[in-house]
Amino acid sequence: MPASVTPTPGVRAEETRTQLVRRARKINRVLAETYPDAHCELDFDNAFQLLVVTVLSAQTTDKRVNAVRPTLFAAYPTPAAMAAADRVDLETIVGPLGFFRAKTEALLKLSAALVENFDGEVPGRLDDLVTLPGVGRKTANVVLGNAFGVPGITVDTHFGRLIRRFGWTEETDPVKAEHAIGALFPKSDWTMLSHHLIWHGRRRCHAKKPACGACPVARWCPSYGAGPTDPAEAEKLVRTEGPN
């Protein structure tokens, strides 16, 4: 961000609903310009792969999940193949991700449910996806938005942190936060909004030390100053790639 940008400290408490909507959409537009290549950072070739890698991404990094993906799907390319997998063999593949026994159990149950209830196909409806073992709204929205083109908001830790820092909502419950943010944006923006905030959270708006002085949306952020505001110091905190 150019050093000449001087953020306005904070957002007035009397901000109206209309002003909030305008500010939120402005932030999203600027983030879209800042991260034109924002996308899901989990690798996948189809809806089944995306569903599986999203489940596996819990409590680990996208980078680690991407590393095991080729071996995993070479061995088990379909729900039927994965449902019939030898447990020990599957545990060996997902072992590097941590919590491998629980994750193996989750994949076996998930694949079996796809075979038994959906003829081995990943459903394209939220109500169906959340009936699958281990699949909540966050995972379902990732799959819908990125594999089916159905708009969805992904409330992960980065997204939740940023919407509160931006003063868009105080909600901490993921479902309530999803609905609160969805009301600020047209549905067509939801999926890319999720990518923009997640990318920004991974690259600049870090949990412990946000790069406030190198933030392209600092002038619209009431949390400006939570991290270093000196541009040179803040720039050192910027990651060119997501840590995951």
List each language-model region with its residue ranges.
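Mixed-charge, low-complexity intrinsically disordered regions
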Residues: 1-4
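Catalytic cores of DNA base-excision repair glycosylases
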Residues: 11-241
